[in-house]
Amino acid sequence: MLFIHVFFQILLFLVSCTIVFSLFHFLVTGNTPSVSTPDWVIGKMAENREIKDGDIFYDLGCGTGRLIFNLSEVFTGTNFIGIENSLPQYLFARVRSFFLKRRNVSIKFENFLKTDLSDADHIYVWIYLRDIKLLKEKFEKELKSGCYIYSLDFPMPDVPVYKTIELKKTSKFGHTLFIYRY
């Protein structure tokens, strides 16, 4: 019983530190704050039939890795790579990786603007328009033909949309998933 109590205290401490450090990271760097993709949106992503065995799926700014860990259960033959540059979020994702032991998931601590994406078949982002503009240039230089880009809520300027999915929840708020194909 003591072990469980200590475990949950440590877990609560890690979650609290993640929130505080994420807020600090946002205030100091001005980078996109860490907000997890809602579970119901992840569920809609899991219905995606374009993801195949052997594909490589990047989550740029993966946070705690919730999206890729959930999708890795559905798409067991796909390799998922999370890229995160916030140390607390990265460490949380690594701890999650240790406990979940998913062989098709890896987490990297690096700036996604410096990540080589030339092997990507799928890329997911939920970031501000300012950062999407930077990524657009990177995508045009690096991505192979046929790569899918999934951008939640923020469209890429001057790039034709392959598909738009209005993700509705029962509440008054929903999301839009913009899908691009390079």
State the predicted function of each range.
Residues 65-69:
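Glycine-rich SAM-binding Motif I of class I
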Residues 53-63:
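Conserved class I S-adenosyl-L-methionine
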Residues 100-112:
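Conserved SAM-binding strand-loop segment of SAM-dependent methyltransferases
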Residues 131-182:
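C-terminal substrate-binding/active-site "lid" region of AdoMet-derived donor-dependent transferases
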Residues 93-94:
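Conserved SAM-binding loop
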Residues 120-134:
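A short SAM/SAH-binding and catalytic strip from SAM-dependent methyltransferases
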Residues 79-84:
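Conserved SAM-binding motif I beta-strand of class I
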Residues 1-52:
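S-adenosyl-L-methionine
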